[in-house]
From Swiss-Prot:
Entry keyword rRNA-binding: yes
Family per similarity comment: Belongs to the universal ribosomal protein uL5 family.
GO molecular function, one term: structural constituent of ribosome
Gene3D superfamilies per record: 3.30.1440.10
Function: This is one of the proteins that bind and probably mediate the attachment of the 5S RNA into the large ribosomal subunit, where it forms part of the central protuberance. In the 70S ribosome it contacts protein S13 of the 30S subunit (bridge B1b), connecting the 2 subunits; this bridge is implicated in subunit movement. Contacts the P site tRNA; the 5S rRNA and some of its associated proteins might help stabilize positioning of ribosome-bound tRNAs.
Lineage: Bacteria, Bacillati, Bacillota, Clostridia, Eubacteriales
Organism domain of life: Bacteria
PROSITE patterns given in the database record: RIBOSOMAL_L5
Subunit comment: Part of the 50S ribosomal subunit; part of the 5S rRNA/L5/L18/L25 subcomplex. Contacts the 5S rRNA and the P site tRNA. Forms a bridge to the 30S subunit in the 70S ribosome.
Protein name: Large ribosomal subunit protein uL5
One GO cellular component term noted in the UniProt record for this chain: ribonucleoprotein complex
Length: 180
């Protein structure tokens, strides 16, 4: 069992039961999945950029990403339907807990001038979204082998019914929210 899953079962879940007065253990919110998405806009000029992005995301998550394609053509962006425009990974189970543990304890503290994550990024249904400006904060990425800095979106999908429950869950798992 991963360290973060153990922390959830032994510390976070009992604390949530106590705070929100759940009558059943099954009502306790849990982390369902984590979705990482990386848009690769420069792929229309440089076809090799997609390989680099896929490789980076594979190193970061330990799982091969799926390549996303354009749903429709947009002339202003010189985009045709079916062109590769990014990649995404959905993490569940132990891989998800290992990634979240690494993100909270290793990657996020490496961000320069980091003062905590905004607590305004909840969607109203208990899911949290955040963005990362470059992939160098992850220890698996070697600085010398990076051709271009690429950011990514990370979405934490929980079974929580409200943002308050989801925020408490993520806080108990170790997400560093800002104090304001």
């Amino acid at each position: 069992m991963t360290r973060l899953k153990d922390k959830y079962l032994n510390e976070a879940a009992p604390a949530l039961i106590e705070k929100f007065k759940y009558s059943s253990r099954m009502q306790v919110p849990k982390l369902e999945k984590v979705v990482l998405n990386m848009g690769v806009g420069e792929v229309k000029d440089n076809p090799k950029a997609m390989d680099s992005a896929v490789n980076d995301m594979t190193l970061i998550t330990g799982q091969k990403p799926i390549v996303t394609k354009a749903k429709k053509s947009v002339a202003a962006f010189k985009l045709r339907q079916g062109m590769n425009i990014g990649c995404k990974v959905t993490l569940r189970g132990d891989r998800m807990y290992e990634f979240v543990d690494k993100l909270f304890n290793v990657a996020i503290p490496r961000v320069r001038d980091f003062r905590g994550l905004s607590s305004n990024s909840f969607d109203g249904r208990g899911n949290y979204s955040m963005g990362i400006k470059d992939q160098l904060i992850f220890p698996e990425i070697e600085y010398d082998k990076v051709d271009k800095l690429r950011g990514m979106d990370i979405v934490f999908v929980t079974t929580a019914k409200s943002d308050e429950e989801a925020k408490e869950l993520l806080k108990l798992l170790g997400m560093p929210f800002s104090q304001n």
